[in-house]
């Protein structure tokens, strides 16, 4: 596809949601300097300017279909940041896994009254539940189990998390 339209940003976001890995743009040019903070605050390419320079919240979600149970479920992450130069702390990131039967459309990523990202306490489906954790290592473990991989520390869990680190750049 055309350069600079967001393909790698989407891949980075999905990878972060599913693996908790904050090393962005591993799939492209490792010298790009892209970061989670830069993506959350919409850093302008090649400039030190941000479209969202102040406090901001970003959600990333992925919906899965369980072919054995014949139902969907969602894995999502919420990142809250005070500013692009502030270091993220563990409490600034929350990973969610829905119970069976929940779809992306059932989660209020956006507050319908304000058009802004939903507050943490409002991020829940009208029916059903979400489990959550702020610990990246616990999130990795829960995500691997939800995907049927087993524990993140198992050989298959380690392989799953490694596969997302593989680069696809022509320069490598």
Describe each PLM feature range.
Residues 1-37:
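Phosphate-binding glycine-rich loops of NTP-binding sites
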Residues 4, 55-56, 159-160:
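Short, well-ordered loop/turn elements at secondary-structure boundaries
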Residues 33-153:
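Nucleotide-state sensing region of NTPase/ATPase domains
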Residues 147-157, 161-172:
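Extended heptad-repeat soluble alpha-helical coiled-coil rod/stalk domains used for dimerization
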